[in-house]
């Protein structure tokens, strides 16, 4: 099968997670999910960048994508997109937790982790939902997510949506 098919299927499978991950940063000054609590190391659990409002917006936008995809892929995709969006954001929170443990401040660059934490959460959701992926689709989305992360963050920085270009 030509590589373009793997790329197309990867984008379709991961579109709810991509949209969810891209929409959360638009929420400013929400209620932190960690309620500003510290871990045993004295550092914040997640930080101010992970909010209930951002989570709600992300899951709502990701699920909305699933409603649209359901017209083409079947009603099951509404469920898949909800779980995928939720677990993508959970993956993003795990990434934030790891960054805090490493002593990295909010917005600090962590190449690889910044681009792939939400993809791993979304992949878990697809597996739970019994959506079969092959290695080519997974590798395609890893490359796509990495490139999109760099491009969209640079655009968001130039538009003053983000304070750093990564």
Swiss-Prot record:
It catalyses: 2,3-bis-O-(geranylgeranyl)-sn-glycerol 1-phosphate + CTP + H(+) = CDP-2,3-bis-O-(geranylgeranyl)-sn-glycerol + diphosphate. One of its GO terms (cellular component) is plasma membrane. Disulfide bonds: none annotated. Its EC number is 2.7.7.67. GO terms for biological process: glycerophospholipid biosynthetic process. The chain crosses the membrane at residues 1-21, 55-75, 78-98, 110-130, 131-151. The keyword Ribosomal protein does not apply. It is an enzyme of class 2 (transferase). It comes from the Archaea. Keywords: Cell membrane, Lipid biosynthesis, Lipid metabolism, Magnesium, Membrane, Phospholipid biosynthesis, Phospholipid metabolism, Transferase, Transmembrane, Transmembrane helix. Its cofactor is Mg(2+). One of its GO terms (molecular function) is CDP-2,3-bis-(O-geranylgeranyl)-sn-glycerol synthase activity. Pathway: Membrane lipid metabolism; glycerophospholipid metabolism. The keyword Cell membrane applies. Belongs to the CDP-archaeol synthase family. Catalyzes the formation of CDP-2,3-bis-(O-geranylgeranyl)-sn-glycerol (CDP-archaeol) from 2,3-bis-(O-geranylgeranyl)-sn-glycerol 1-phosphate (DGGGP) and CTP. This reaction is the third ether-bond-formation step in the biosynthesis of archaeal membrane lipids. HAMAP family: CDP_archaeol_synth. This is CDP-archaeol synthase. It comes from Sulfurisphaera tokodaii (strain DSM 16993 / JCM 10545 / NBRC 100140 / 7). The lineage of its organism: Archaea, Thermoproteota, Thermoprotei, Sulfolobales, Sulfolobaceae.
